[in-house]
Amino acid sequence: MSKRTILIALVTLSLVAGASALATRATASRSHATSRSMLVGIFDDPMTLGTPDKGFPLLKGLRAQIVRITLTWRSVAPKRPKVATDPADPAYDWSVFDRAVLLAKKNKIQVLFGIQGTPAWANGRRSARIAPTNYRDLQNFATAAAKRYSGSFKRKDSDTEETLLPAVRLWLAWNEPNNPNFLAPQYKKVHGRWLALGAYQYARICNAIYAGIHGAGVGTERVACGATDPFGNNQPKSRRASISPLAFLRLSKRYGLRRFDAWAHHPYAPMPSESPAAKPKKLKATSVILGNIGDLTKEVTRLYGGKPIWITEYGYQTRPPDKFFGVSWKTQAKYLSQSYAIARKNRRIGMFVWFLIRDERALRGWQSGFFTASGARKPSYTAFRRLKH
């Protein structure tokens, strides 16, 4: 997942739009209690899906309790299935994900599946970041996924052999839906007025995935919505319109987002000069980073009650190789430990997921891994292994 261009745009636009921010500053008094059951994990699809025989042993060595994996609807269902709620429908290809969950079980790691990416047949042959035309298609896919990874589904390997697939109980609805890289467009003009289309569509995406997962009849699954980008400009006329996370949460509620089991967020700092404890510099912040995550907790509580908060993506890049966005290797390890401590002190935070095991090779990508692209180990590897959980 490349965020270099995203962060440059968001930092620039947030400086312009700061005065028009929609966030309400507040720190929940509960944040000082310890989160004793917080799951700690890693998100690195190239390692877990691309080279899983290497990726999963590394996860085990890092003592990861959970791995986030993108379950791409478009790749599983390149063609419309005849019986969409049946995980054995021949239109579906789950092979990559079956392999991942089997290796996760072998290494005693839980899986968090994030459903995203609309198939061409479901949105008029447009980009994967365009919402489905009929949200029932997405709901049916979520049901099929939950059934396949219910813990009781047997994959038929041959006429005489079957494989019992492990259970997946944790699910995520989309990725950064307030960011046009993942859900577009964010705004649309309707009858002369701007509609926050991203939030409108996401309310339906979340409802569909929640209903599909819980409708499978497993009974112990949990579905998180949100997975929001920490920034947003709230400027529909801008070249790269996006919606700030608190505004997106409120708008999703207004447009009919009914329920979820947890709210997920990605509280990245905007610049390497800002530590995990730093708060947004603007008096009325549009962003939600780790230092002011209490603002998000308070708003979720106001709108939906005391739902858990999941940090499903976080990290600091290093220099080398990243001279602009990176911190030193030593500082990355220190910030990792600090960010974990901040999250763990907040009893509402139930999950903390670091982004990347290994750096992406292209500099336009992301370099927050515990290893460089060439395999050199950073001090953050040891820091992550030493996290107390």
Model-derived features: positions:
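Bacterial N-terminal signal peptides
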Residues: 9-18
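Boundary/entry segment of secreted carbohydrate-active catalytic domains
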Residues: 29-66, 70-72
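Acidic (Asp/Glu)-rich catalytic clusters
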Residues: 32-35, 56-63, 99-110, 162-163, ...
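Structural recognition of the beta-strand scaffold that forms the well-ordered cores
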Residues: 39-44, 65-75, 110-115, 169-173, ...
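Noncatalytic carbohydrate-binding groove/subsite architecture in carbohydrate-active enzymes
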Residues: 52-53, 139, 143-169, 190, ...
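Aromatic-lined substrate-binding rim segments of carbohydrate-active enzymes
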Residues: 56-61, 70-146, 192-226, 285-286
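Surface-exposed, active-site-proximal loop segments in enzymatic domains
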Residues: 75-94, 118-140, 157, 164, ...
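Aromatic-rich peripheral "rim/lid" segments of glycoside hydrolase catalytic domains that contact
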Residues: 167-172, 177, 182, 318-389
